[in-house]
Amino acid sequence: MERYGRPGEEGSRSDPSLEWTSHGGETAVEAPMWRLGLSGGGGGGGGGESYPERPDEPDCIYYLRTGVCGYGSRCRFNHPRDRGAVIGGVRGEAGALPERMGHPVCQHFMRTGTCKFGASCKYHHPRQGGGGGSVAPVSLSYLGYPLRPGEKECSYYLRTGQCKFGLTCRFNHPVPLAVQGPPQQPQQQQPQPQPQLQTIYPTLQSQSIPSSQQYGLVLTRPSFLTGSYLQSPYGPPMVLPPGMVPYSGWNPYQASLSAMPSPGTQPSIGSSSIYGLTPLSPSATAYTGTYQSVPSSNSTSKEFPQRPDQPECQYFMRTGDCKFGSSCRYHHPVDAVPPKTGIVLSSIGLPLRPGVAQCTHFAQHGICKFGPACKFDHSMSSSLSYSPSASSLTDMPVAPYPIGSSSLSGSSAPVSSSNEPTKEAVTPAVSSMVSGLSRPEPAETSGDSASVSGSIEAKTSS
């Protein structure tokens, strides 16, 4: 602090603070540091601590900027004595980047022509970029980001459409494909006469649809099947999808529409329902198939790896299949699982294996977690069997039951499979009914009626 007592001696020295303050751009901290003389070298360095000079190392940026170094003698960078000369060479002119001969070249400066560290950068910034010519200016897109065709694309820019580094980013920022530049005015095209397309729905009025020639474009109408346009009684016309087009002989179990029906076979819309769907006739072919067979080609389409030195794949040994396929690291023996010649599946998609033990889980819960790969039987019990052909209870034969008798005769009459009872079944029933009608009333019944009539006569006489 004794430096304040010797202003004359300080004035004789070359104070680099004059050069520092002659150029703009200092912060509010650097100028007072220079006035206080908190520097370590000959450029106004008081204080007893000396900083190491390492000419082969880069300059200590913090020391050049503030005049002090927190690491002291342990700092591994260079601390020149004449700090003012170094800063004067760096800031020879306003806005110039430092030229440090013998130091590595600033790669960011060589690519972009700019340096975000400015005068504090510790690398060399040659005046002539690269091969002796001036650094070519970076071309910018209309979005304001640099275009560098030879560099890697900026992943953040491709993901978000923005880049926080802006002009200093060293990656390429291509223009998105959807936005190739400012929108240009479309050229006016003279409308050309187009051949009229034959419509398959003549009741649709084309005046309500704007013409495609107003926009200079040629639009085509989507193709519909014949009869897909219907007039709805509740509002505007309705267009049905191709899957709902009515035609004769429609069956819900047919695969697909293989050909377009002819207009002659088209049923009239008025005789159909509101949506033009033809109801199924009673004579339509019913789906009576309960089981389906799995072709054996599916089992041979996969080949599993043979690894004798590895443990066996337990899933393959249990089900005969492996979801990992050729990438499974376990052994898949060929002779472990017998070849599948054909599997018969039930209506719920479980295998039927006559002669094999029944699946206990399916017998208890009605489901099987292994599905078609289960090796046990999944046959439905006789009490739970269902026949799709028995569609109504009215079709089932009903045996006649006599009204007057509590039970039939001792020997039960045979029941016919047809709806009409046979002669042998009707004869004992009729005879029992006749005998019941001709039977006299019991005595108790006649006595009760006599007592009731006597009580009525006594009340009237009194």
UniProtKB/Swiss-Prot annotation:
GO terms under cellular component: nucleus
Record GO terms (molecular function): DNA binding; mRNA binding; zinc ion binding
Annotated spans, Disordered: 1-26, 288-310, 405-462
Residue ranges with Polar residues bias: 288-303, 446-462
The keyword Zinc-finger belongs to this UniProt entry's keyword annotation: yes
Zinc finger map (C3H1-type): 54-82, 100-128, 148-176, 307-335, 353-381
Claim: Metal-binding is one of the keywords in the record: yes
Keyword line: DNA-binding, Metal-binding, Nucleus, Repeat, Zinc, Zinc-finger
InterPro entries: Plant_ZF_CCCH, Znf_CCCH, Znf_CCCH_sf
Positions with biased composition (Basic and acidic residues): 1-13
Residue stretches spanning the membrane: none
A Pfam match: zf-CCCH
Localization: Nucleus
Ranges of compositional bias, category Low complexity: 405-418
Identification of the protein by name: Zinc finger CCCH domain-containing protein 34
Organismal lineage: Eukaryota, Viridiplantae, Streptophyta, Embryophyta, Tracheophyta
